[in-house]
C-alpha cells in the first residue's frame, strides 16, 4: 500500500487544540452510548429479568455467531428528542452474522 504524505503538522497548536476538542466529543459519545446500552433503567431491567426474560442485548448476543461483530445502526435514535429517556428509541437494529450469514437484526427493547 502506498503512503500518502501530508503537510499537516501534528505538533502545531491548532492541530493539538483540534485533537483535544475532538477527544472531548469522543468521550461524550462513549459516555452517552454506555448509558444507552444499559437499556431502560435498573427497575425496568430487573422487572424484565424477574419474569425470566433475557434483556434485549442478551438476546442479540445469543443470536450472533460467537465472536462475530455486531454493527449497531440506530443506538442514538430518539436521543434527546423527548422529555423522558427512550434509549435507542426502544429498538436495537444492526448487522451481524448468524449461522455464517450476514443478517439485519431487529430486537424490540421493552425495558
Mark where each language-model region is.
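Terminal-region recognition feature
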Residues: 1-111
